[in-house]
Amino acid sequence: MNKQRRAKIESEVLAAQTAIEALRFALQNLQDLATEEQECFDNMPEGLQASENGQRIEEIAQAFESANDSLSSAIDDAESAIEEIEEAVNQ
């Protein structure tokens, strides 16, 4: 591998790491929103929890949680891929 290609790879790895940091920030914000929605549902009286609006809030909280899990997994996979690239380049 020549210096020019190595520099390009390092630049792209840095860009990917920056994107991952942005995703982590977004993930934290989504987790905060999921917590807020779940707390909203949990603080409702049982009668309201069973209402259409209560069920909708619970569904939204669950959707946020599912999305958070998927995004977290994707971030972990991306970090692993970057580590593999760095190891290959530095051999």
Regions of interest found by a model, annotated:
Residues 2-91:
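Long, low-complexity or tandemly repetitive, helically biased scaffold regions used
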